[in-house]
Curated annotation (Swiss-Prot):
Protein task: Inhibits bovine trypsin with a Ki of 0.174 nM and trypsin-like proteases from G.mellonella larvae. Has no activity against serine proteases chymotrypsin, subtilisin and elastase. Has no activity against cysteine proteases from beetle gut.
Keywords per UniProt: Disulfide bond, Protease inhibitor, Serine protease inhibitor
GO BP terms in the entry: negative regulation of peptidase activity
Annotated source species: Fagopyrum esculentum (Common buckwheat)
Protein name: Trypsin inhibitor 2c
Lineage: Eukaryota, Viridiplantae, Streptophyta, Embryophyta, Tracheophyta
GO molecular function, one term: serine-type endopeptidase inhibitor activity
Length: 41
């Protein structure tokens, strides 16, 4: 079975690859976390 944690890390990696400000990347990572938290319920 696919591990949500791995998908979360991939999502966050995409955020980091973008040439955004640190704040924007952080916001993007947070959205990933929120998305995967909802999926697990």
């Amino acid at each position: 079975s696919e591990k949500p944690q791995q998908e979360l890390e991939e999502c966050q990696n995409v955020c980091r690859m973008k040439r955004w400000s640190t704040e924007m990347v952080h916001r993007c990572e947070k959205k990933c976390e929120e998305k995967f938290e909802r999926q697990q319920r």
